[in-house]
Structure formats: C-alpha cells, structure tokens
Design a protein with these regions (language model features):
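Walker A (P-loop) ATP-phosphate-binding motif of ABC ATPase nucleotide-binding domains
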Residues: 2
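Hydrophobic anchor at the beta1->P-loop junction of P-loop NTPases
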Residues: 5
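Walker A (P-loop) phosphate-binding loop of P-loop NTPases
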Residues: 10
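Conserved lysine of the Walker
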Residues: 13
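Hydrophobic positions on the alpha1 helix immediately C-terminal to the Walker A/P-loop
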Residues: 16
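NTP-dependent small-molecule kinase module
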Residues: 19-21, 136-203
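ATP-dependent small-molecule kinase phosphotransfer cores
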Residues: 29-121
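A glycine- and Lys/Arg-enriched "phosphate-lid" helix/loop adjacent to the NTP-binding pocket
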Residues: 93, 97-164
Length: 203
C-alpha cells in the first residue's frame, strides 16, 4: 500500500507519519518511510537545490522540472521496489504537492503538471491524508521550528492558494484523499489515520 501525506507548512505531517509508522510496525507490517522531494541520495541533492533560500533566482519551470526529476528517481529506486516487495510506503508529499504548490502557489497551468505526471509517474497513492489547518496556524508553527526554507518564506496569499488547490483535489478524488482537521490533537489525528489505514488494508 502506498500512502501519501499532504498539507501546507506546519500542519504536523512529520509527527503523524512517525506515529503511524510505529503503529504499523507494531501490527507486523513492513514499512518504508520516505519523502518528497528526496528519498534517494540523488533526489536529496535536488531537494537541497529546491529548498535552499540563498541561491540564484529559480524559474517556476526549473522548479517544476527539478521536482519531477527527483520524483522519477524516487519512484524507480524506492517506491516501486518497496511496493513490489509488499511493503507499506509512507511518503511525506507526492504529486498532489506539485499541483498545490506549483499550480496553486506558483499559478502554473495545471495541464503542464498533469502532463508530467502522466509521463513520469507510474503509480499514484492508494490513500492520501490531507492535514488541513488555517494558513496562519501552520505558518506560526513553521516559524517556531527555526530557519525557514525557500518555500516557507513565501507570502500568506501563496499558501492560501496552495490550500485552495488541496481542497479542490480532495473534492475531485474523495475516494483517495481524506481531509483531517490538523488543529486537533496529534493523538486524535493519528487515531483517525490509523483507523482508515487498517480498514483499507482489510480489503
């Protein structure tokens, strides 16, 4: 099973993923924890290029192509092999993030992103948890973590557009995407997620 976790900055994805990973291991499942951009040595180098704020200005086209280069490497070297071995893959962000951030945030044409997905993404998640919180709540949490990366330094209206596209994706693909109110306690969020995962694993 392939599970992705989505949301704007500071919504608690990392906490949920770590908790869910431990719960699934305790239930006897073999779990692979990974992230985007990143997940392989090469893809992590691309991640560094994408997130470092102190570099030359990056065009939106360059940003998008770097993301999909990292994703292609990640899929072929980590996600697809793990799924072929019957493992559960927990991935911090996947293709929905490209729609939300590059189409919503950067306002790139959706068809450009859809085309790359069709060409280079051989597998979509079986289940996606969208952790949703007001932008100001998430950004305050992100600031409390310390130095902000290149995306976290964007303006509030950027993240407002990102959130709107996540909501649109959830409406369009309600069978796959589950919205979770990220202002709830971490314990409650983890229980909701675990309940949905275990129910899906039974079928």
């Amino acid at each position: 099973m392939f599970i992705s976790f989505e949301g704007t900055e500071g919504v608690g994805k990392s906490t949920l993923i770590a908790t869910l990973q431990q719960a699934l291991i305790e239930l006897g499942f073999d779990v692979v924890l990974t992230r985007e951009p990143g997940g392989t040595p090469l893809a992590e180098k691309i991640r560094d290029l994408l997130l470092q704020p102190d570099q030359e200005s990056m065009s939106v086209q360059t940003e998008l192509l770097l993301l999909y280069a990292a994703r292609a490497q990640h899929l072929s070297h980590v996600i697809l092999p793990a799924l072929a071995q019957g493992k559960i893959v927990l991935c911090d962000r996947f293709v929905d993030a490209s729609l939300a951030y590059q189409h919503g945030g950067r306002q790139m044409p959706r068809e450009d992103i859809d085309l790359l997905t069709q060409q280079f993404v051989a597998k979509l998640p079986d289940l996606t948890f969208w952790l949703d919180a007001p932008v100001e709540v998430g950004m305050q949490r992100a600031k409390n973590r310390g130095a902000l990366d290149r995306f976290e330094q964007e303006k509030m209206d950027f993240f407002g557009r990102v959130r709107e596209v996540y909501a649109q994706i959830a409406r369009e693909d309600a069978q796959r995407v589950l919205r979770i109110d990220a202002t709830q306690s971490a314990e409650h969020i983890a229980q909701v997620a675990l309940t949905h995962v275990t129910a899906k694993l039974k079928y």
